[in-house]
Amino acid sequence: MNEHSDDVYVRARLRNQFGYMTWVPEYVEDRISSKKGILQRYEDYQQKQAKAQEVKTDSLVKYEGAKDVPRNLLRIYRGEADTSALARYEEVVSQKPQWHAPWKLTRVINGHTGWVRCVCVDPVDNAWFATGSNDSTIRVWDLATGKLKVTLQGHIMTVRDICISARHPYMFSASQDKLVKCWDLERNTVVRDFHGTLSGVHSVDLHPSLDLIVSAGRDSVVRVWDIRSRSCVLTLAGHRGPINKVRCLPVDPQIVSCSTDATVKLWDLVAGKPMKTLTHHKRNVRDLAFNPTEFSFASACTDDIRSWKLVDGQLLTNFNSEALGIVNTLACNQDGVLFAGGDTGELSFFDYKTGHKFQKLETTAMPGSLESEKGVLASTFDRTGLRLLTCERDKSIKIWKHIDGATQDSHPGLPWNPSLVRQRF
């Protein structure tokens, strides 16, 4: 390699490695100077002196440079240091959480004889809701009055999940008896049974645009069923533990599932395999909640709630969820409020965008119940987002609403202490 080609190589390497920098490291300058002749180095020195004399200053004493100041401090002063952490902190501080009105208990509904495990609100008229329980029954309640409308019997074990169709008069239920049942809400009878699951079914959901339902449970497999033919059209295997929750979307990823193997999987329904596996959680992931106003969702495990961007599964926010204990349920409304309920009976309300917990309540066990039976097992907001329904171990359903007339001055909420922890992977 001749001298000319060597010089071209050095210049190209300097441009690629240091072209974006406003200063060049001293060791690089020394190597460059060592290759220059005496006359060229003298000319460079004269040019630097001429530029220094052209700098105008109002100071009375000529600045001769810092002598005893460490080099890293000089770089910070000159703005040459890596300020990524500082920039991130300033970004966190600038994103102040939105104020939300506090919530209070307004109604307690009793009727089940076992733990209430699931709840779903009428997606059409927002006039009634259904609950499933350990007593193997499904009960339909009037949302305005809290009165029982009908009791559906057909399962022989715990009813773990319910979903209601917005296009057809059907309701689907999943149970520990290995069955998924389709209920005709006009006749209040079972019209279809979906057989084939090898163990208890923990979750069921209806596809928003296709005549398909998706179920998952203890056998660690997600199954896709054709409603009309009652046949299993697709089996999605990949989880290494029982699946706690499965949810459907009208676009990719059309299926999202979470499991006791501490993972969340985003499934490609056409390819029949996971698009993405989220492994950020360290423990059993118990529930998922989609944001109704943006394309993202939240997931929860013990002492850890995170939100994710779809489609790529990018981590958005680490919620301020320390010391929450086991989180059993999540729910999100249109106002950006994320609710979390767990085994300890604590009800936590978060600002979805910033992850700030603005209110903390504690549910009260019903008279005659044990203190350990005040845990929250399931929850959902109604279609307006103004009422929260919680299902609890004390066999009750509780309805929560905003405090009337609350303002930011009268109810400021819990203090906001921003940190970089919520953005950490």
Curated annotation (Swiss-Prot):
Pfam families: WD40 (PF00400). InterPro entries: G-protein_beta_WD-40_rep (IPR020472), Prp46/PLRG1-like (IPR045241), WD40/YVTN_repeat-like_dom_sf (IPR015943), WD40_repeat_CS (IPR019775), WD40_repeat_dom_sf (IPR036322), WD40_rpt (IPR001680). Its main location: cytoplasm. WD repeats lie at residues 111-151, 154-193, 196-235, 238-279, 281-320, 322-360, 371-410. Keywords: Cytoplasm, mRNA processing, mRNA splicing, Nucleus, Repeat, Spliceosome, WD repeat. One of its GO terms (biological process) is mRNA cis splicing, via spliceosome. It is found in: Cytoplasm; Nucleus. One of its GO terms (cellular component) is cytoplasm. The keyword Zinc-finger does not apply. Transmembrane segments: none annotated. It comes from the Eukaryota. The keyword Repeat applies. PANTHER family: PLEIOTROPIC REGULATOR 1, WD40 REPEAT PROTEINPRL1/PRL2-RELATED. Belongs to the WD repeat PRL1/PRL2 family. Associated with the spliceosome. Involved in pre-mRNA splicing and required for cell cycle progression at G2/M. This is Pre-mRNA-splicing factor PRP46. It comes from Eremothecium gossypii (strain ATCC 10895 / CBS 109.51 / FGSC 9923 / NRRL Y-1056).
